[in-house]
């Protein structure tokens, strides 16, 4: 693990120090034996040892005010700890706040559409359901041309349900 020690004149206690540790999820013991008050865990659905790592890490996280645990990931099928934690969060069975961000909220995911572009029936349904514009639909077309619709829906899902069902 890499560790950065931080001291700051802005801390109330001038002798206080904080640290930032960076682990990779490649080792099943990553994060074990630590007591983080803030943990940002990235691409959790793709960890090889997700259950073991999270079990060890979660035991060290104090249940106190100011503690934050952020788990974020592209979905990787309806399986694994990320999926289980997501499902439980949606059902209100844990303290996590489920947040899904669809591809079309990203301003960069659009291309100027050609004049006279005609939408397919499926594209018309997407426009209606998600209030998309033709520039977004054209960007989507170009991405689908790169790798197919299945790959697009896996990497750029429109709903959480689609993210978990299409991937993996």
Predicted regions and their residues:
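Conserved RecA-like ASCE ATPase "motif II neighborhood" in helicase/translocase motors
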Residues: 2-60
């Amino acid at each position: 693990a890499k560790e950065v020690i931080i001291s700051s004149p802005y801390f109330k206690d001038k002798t206080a120090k904080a640290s930032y540790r960076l682990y990779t999820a490649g080792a099943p013991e990553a994060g074990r034996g630590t007591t983080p008050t803030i943990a940002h865990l990235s691409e959790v659905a793709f960890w090889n040892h997700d259950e073991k790592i999270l079990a060890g890490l979660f035991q060290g996280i104090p249940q106190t005010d100011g503690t934050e645990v952020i788990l974020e990931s592209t979905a990787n099928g309806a399986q694994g700890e990320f999926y289980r934690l997501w499902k439980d969060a949606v059902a209100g069975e844990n303290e996590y706040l489920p947040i899904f961000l669809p591809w079309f909220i990203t301003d960069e995911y659009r291309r100027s559409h050609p004049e006279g572009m005609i939408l397919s029936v499926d594209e018309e349904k997407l426009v209606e359901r998600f209030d998309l514009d033709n520039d977004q639909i054209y960007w989507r077309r170009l991405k689908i041309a790169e790798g197919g619709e299945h790959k697009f829906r896996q990497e750029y899902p429109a709903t959480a349900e689609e993210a978990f069902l299409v991937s993996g």
